[in-house]
Amino acid sequence: KLVKLIGEAKELGVDMFLLDDGWFANKYPRHSDTQGLGDWDETADKLPNGIGRLTEEAKKQGVKFGLWIELEMVNPKSELYENHKDWVITLPNRNEYYFRNQLVLDLSNPKVQDYVFDVVDNLMTKYPDIAYFKWDCNSPITNIYSNYEGKNQEKLYVDYVRGLYKVLDRIKAKYPDLPMMLCSGGGGRTDYEGLKYFTEMWPSDNTDPIERLFIQYGYSQVFPAKVQCAHVTTWNKKAPIKFRTNVAMMGKLGFDLNLHDLSADDLAFCKQSIKEYNRLKPVILDGDQYRLVSPYEGNHTATMFVDKQDRNAVVFAFDVHPRYNEKLDNIKLQGLNPKATYSVREINRADCASDNNPKTYSGQYLMTVGLPLFTNNDLSSRIYELNQQ
């Protein structure tokens, strides 16, 4: 089944297949979130040929292979917990409190730091074609007490973070080119220090495209698009696939979908979107971002990306829930060369057709008069590409 999914990922046009939670543990197989966390060996019944069979298939298909891990956590129903209960943050003489059926490992303890590093190191040594890790963290620190810290319990929070950074420093030193996503029950770990170790971050588990317009707008005030993971999912199916995909194209685009649930037209649109995204990625991920219209200020929102030479730009425009016959003004663009001339055309259209009649404007006109980016259509969106002539 997984081999088939890797083939479908290749057909879709994405460059990486990520195997998420559920691939590990044998004594207590990870059939649910109640067990197995901490035992990072492949479940033999699920993966009789190991991760290597999947990395080989991904390589054959020309797709990178990524893997989900949550190394800071442990389920009480696991071999790790049975063998090293003293490695777990738990209050003595108190009932344990579980968040998502799990507890937190004590990363202030050097032995735990070694264990966490060794999991990554062993996976990379055994399966060097692993190209990406999704590093998850789905629980706050509960039952706050360290068996390692002894009388210095007041240092635990700080020493925990320092211990985590020591692990990440070791991973970075040995695998400097290994991309990793930082995820924590959504965006709970989104911070600047994380950028030293992680190539991207997961802003929120809420992937409703309407909510994501607000989330990504706020996120962009602090972090650039190139570290913002944005995926197309099944949340809010009232929003057309075009709307959902266009929202996700404003960050690091991904798809969390069963392709068999898509119509032929929607599948064709997703394939087209990936091609357009790959072509425009340098502008979106490495260009300057301009927030033209805030989603907090009305029924529409628009964001613009301009490359460093002011030659190429991409404008995303969204109509969320416009009012009937709402008055729509032109939106002034930003970041262009006022003396240059730009061609403007709509791309990534729902009919998958090309706009063969681009219009031409001066940068001065686009920034002082603007363009009619919005419509009165509910949950509609458009992407415009600008190229200097």
Predicted regions span which residues?
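Aromatic-lined carbohydrate-binding/catalytic grooves of carbohydrate-active enzymes
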Residues: 1-118, 127-132
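Conserved, mostly hydrophobic/aromatic
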Residues: 17, 58, 116, 180, ...
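Active-site proximal loops enriched in glycine and acidic residues that flank catalytic Cys/His/Asp
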Residues: 21, 67-71, 137, 182-186, ...
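Flexible loop/turn segments at secondary-structure boundaries
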Residues: 23-30, 72-78, 139-144, 187-192, ...
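Active-site neighborhood of glycoside hydrolase catalytic domains
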Residues: 46-50, 88-242, 252-257, 261, ...
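Catalytic cores of secreted or luminal carbohydrate-active enzymes
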Residues: 245-293
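Carbohydrate-binding surface patches
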Residues: 294-337
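C-terminal beta-sandwich/jelly-roll accessory domains of carbohydrate-active enzymes
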Residues: 321-389
